[in-house]
Amino acid sequence: MDRMEGPPDVVVRRLPLYARSLRYLLQEGVESVSSQELGDRINVTAAQIRKDLSYFGEFGKQGIGYDVRRLLQQIEDILGLTQEWPVALIGIGHLGEAIARYEGFRQQGIRIAGLFDSNPTKIGKAINGMTVQSFDDAERVIREQGIRLAIIAVPARNAQEVADRLVMAGVRAILSYAPTVLQVPEGVWVRYIDPVAILHSMTYYLARDIAGVRHNNPET
């Protein structure tokens, strides 16, 4: 059976930006916000915000705006953040260790549930209250804990093998920092963070700015 068609991926990618801005508004004591005010914070038009939200139902009232707390709760519900998601982190080099130490995950529904590496010098190391385990144990731990999310922070040459084993263990969503494209089965979602590729996309705009070519600001 085909999956139900959902909103465009670019819309889903903007929802966390809306949620983050709404959290800031709550911290500032703001109770109500217009689509224009929200859009100004993240470089998105008011019309785009209204269109994005329309994929998921009706939000706010015309002329009144959005109740900040309620809209945040609704977006968190859409994103599945009403529950905590355990995550397996593979690769505990400098980058992986920094990710493991990041305190912002748990505050937003994400819990690093296991640290794994194949380097004997890393195995057994204590990081942020957890112990690095052998990657050979990852499949068992993932199955036992029902982990569906994983972060890959390994060299490109190892990334595909790691992804294959994660998928076999039941992982269905992967965030990869490895500078390579992963081949995964249908029904497995992959996102990439490649700082070099992102910087190259920014040098495109810088080069044209230096040359005097006018262009719109890239999407936030």
From Swiss-Prot:
Pfam families: CoA_binding, Put_DNA-bind_N
Binding-site residues for NAD(+), renumbered to this chain: 91-96
Listed GO MF terms: DNA binding; DNA-binding transcription factor activity
Spans through the membrane: none
Gene Ontology, cellular component aspect: cytoplasm
SMART domains from the UniProt entry: CoA_binding
Disulfide bond entries: none
A GO BP annotation: response to redox state
Subcellular location: Cytoplasm
Top-rank taxon: Bacteria
DNA-binding interval(s): 17-56
Function in brief: Modulates transcription in response to changes in cellular NADH/NAD(+) redox state.
PANTHER family per the UniProt record, alphabetical: REDOX-SENSING TRANSCRIPTIONAL REPRESSOR REX, REDOX-SENSING TRANSCRIPTIONAL REPRESSOR REX 1
Name used for this protein in its record: Redox-sensing transcriptional repressor Rex
Gene that encodes the chain: rex
